[in-house]
Amino acid sequence: MGVSVDVHQVYKYPFEQVVASFLRKYPNPMDKNVISVKIMEEKRDESTGVIYRKRIAICQNVVPEILRKSLSTLVILCWKKVSILKVPNIQLEEESWLNPRERNMAIRSHCLTWTQYASMKEESVFRESMENPNWTEFIQRGRISITGVGFLNCVLETFASTFLRQGAQKGIRIMEMLLKEQCGAPLAE
């Protein structure tokens, strides 16, 4: 089945400032779930000017203990051995393509942990707003699918959907705070 989460936000700040804040967003005391972010690869295409980055984020396992125990019990009943939900941290991989000339950045991320049971993918874009060239539009679509755990698929997907929605809103609040701290008040219309 799977669940999707869509986010759309206009930041009243120029593209360059928004992207710089995004790249510095984590770790942040406002979101304790993101423990660290490490750049694994960064390169510039000399012909296009596009900057490619691959980053790995280490995040706390946010699956509630009751769901971890329920799933472990179900897995034991099904004669399968799985302790993957008991891990303290999960890893996310993020790839981004920043095109400074066209003032856009595309981002794709996915979960590296739990791939046997879950698929979590996000696609995001930062781009110059059509409303005002000094503003930046952010569009994100996330999708989670859980498989292999029977009736708990739906329970875990519902939890994941709620967590993703709340996480997206928290991410927007963090971005707004960082932009205001680093760049001052938002630009007027």
Curated annotation (Swiss-Prot):
GO BP annotations listed: phospholipid transport
UniProt GO MF annotations: phosphatidic acid transfer activity
Sequence ranges assigned to domain PRELI/MSF1 in this UniProt record: 1-187
Superkingdom of origin: Eukaryota
Any single Gene Ontology cellular-component annotation: mitochondrial intermembrane space
Name recorded for this polypeptide: PRELI domain-containing protein 2
Source organism (scientific name): Homo sapiens
